[in-house]
Every structure is written in C-alpha cells, then in structure tokens.
From Swiss-Prot:
SUPFAM superfamilies according to UniProt: FAD/NAD(P)-binding domain (SSF51905)
Cysteines paired by S-S bonds: none
UniProt family annotation: Belongs to the GMC oxidoreductase family.
Organism: Acanthamoeba polyphaga mimivirus (APMV)
Protein name (record): Putative truncated GMC-type inactive oxidoreductase R833
Entries under InterPro entries matching the protein: FAD/NAD-bd_sf, GMC_OxRdtase, GMC_OxRtase_C
GO molecular function, one term: oxidoreductase activity, acting on CH-OH group of donors
Top-level division of the source organism's lineage: Viruses
Length: 81
C-alpha cells in the first residue's frame, strides 16, 4: 500500500477498505411484501415461482443465515406442498 509505510493506522485502514467483504450472506434482497406473497412465498405475477431463501428475510439475523434459511424454507415448503 503506497503512502502507508510510516503510518500503521493508515495502513490498517487502507487494508481494511481494500480487502474487507460482507461474507456473502445477503438477506432482504426480495423482502416479503410487494414482490412475494408472505403466506406462500409465491412471486406475484407467476403461477409456479416461489422464493424460499434468505432473500425474503426482511432483516439480517445476528448469526449465520443458514438456520434462518432452513426455517423459512421449511415453513413455506409446508404451505406449498
């Protein structure tokens, strides 16, 4: 990192900004409401397209999204089948 040789605080900040990532646990990208029926997971305007993953969760959970996704998928699959 140029210009950071004598200032470690600047170096760590620049490193963080350059290499930090979200971990790819996206949620809420298709939040229940206007696009998806909250009771069935059915996408409005389609006959057979369901969303049952973390994209329908309106707020990001504190932990890993895996358990939340299992619950959402399980509950909505019971309603679908």
């Amino acid at each position: 990192m140029p210009n950071c040789y004598n200032n470690m605080t600047e170096f760590y900040l620049a490193s963080y900004l350059q290499f930090a990532s979200s971990g790819y646990h996206y949620t809420g990208t298709c939040a229940l409401g206007k696009v998806v029926d909250p009771n069935t997971g059915l996408v409005y305007g389609f006959e057979n397209l369901y969303v049952t993953d973390a994209s329908v969760v309106p707020k990001t959970p504190r932990g890993n999204t895996q358990a939340t996704t299992y619950v959402v998928s399980g509950k909505l699959s019971e309603k679908i089948f």
